[in-house]
Amino acid sequence: MSLTLDEVRRIAALARLRLSPEEERTFAGQLSAILDHVAQLAELDVSGVEPMTHALAEGVPSRPDEVRPGLPPEEALANAPAREGTFFVVPRIIE
């Protein structure tokens, strides 16, 4: 599957990414290659393969929580599309 530059621009806009024309061309090729690979995987016959919920039999290894310093507010909000004081502004989804 080959993505068009318009499709790459739409995906970038949804992800709130600004891409240069060169990056758009690069990502169009890379994303197309990924989609081609996924299409190949979709063609495989996996009817005899037992479903699994996790790649590791023992599950996800855990580790103890560790308290570490966070980012300063200005650094955390540096790439926010909208902010109010030291808070992120997000679209209202519940009335």
From Swiss-Prot:
One of its GO terms (biological process) is translation. SUPFAM superfamilies: Glu-tRNAGln amidotransferase C subunit (SSF141000). The keyword Nucleotide-binding applies. Its EC number is 6.3.5.-. It catalyses: L-glutamyl-tRNA(Gln) + L-glutamine + ATP + H2O = L-glutaminyl-tRNA(Gln) + L-glutamate + ADP + phosphate + H(+); L-aspartyl-tRNA(Asn) + L-glutamine + ATP + H2O = L-asparaginyl-tRNA(Asn) + L-glutamate + ADP + phosphate + 2 H(+). One of its GO terms (molecular function) is asparaginyl-tRNA synthase (glutamine-hydrolyzing) activity. It is an enzyme of class 6 (ligase). Keywords: ATP-binding, Ligase, Nucleotide-binding, Protein biosynthesis. Pfam families: GatC (PF02686). It comes from the Bacteria. Belongs to the GatC family. Heterotrimer of A, B and C subunits. HAMAP family: GatC. Allows the formation of correctly charged Asn-tRNA(Asn) or Gln-tRNA(Gln) through the transamidation of misacylated Asp-tRNA(Asn) or Glu-tRNA(Gln) in organisms which lack either or both of asparaginyl-tRNA or glutaminyl-tRNA synthetases. The reaction takes place in the presence of glutamine and ATP through an activated phospho-Asp-tRNA(Asn) or phospho-Glu-tRNA(Gln). This is Aspartyl/glutamyl-tRNA(Asn/Gln) amidotransferase subunit C. It comes from Anaeromyxobacter sp. (strain Fw109-5). The lineage of its organism: Bacteria, Pseudomonadati, Myxococcota, Myxococcia, Myxococcales.
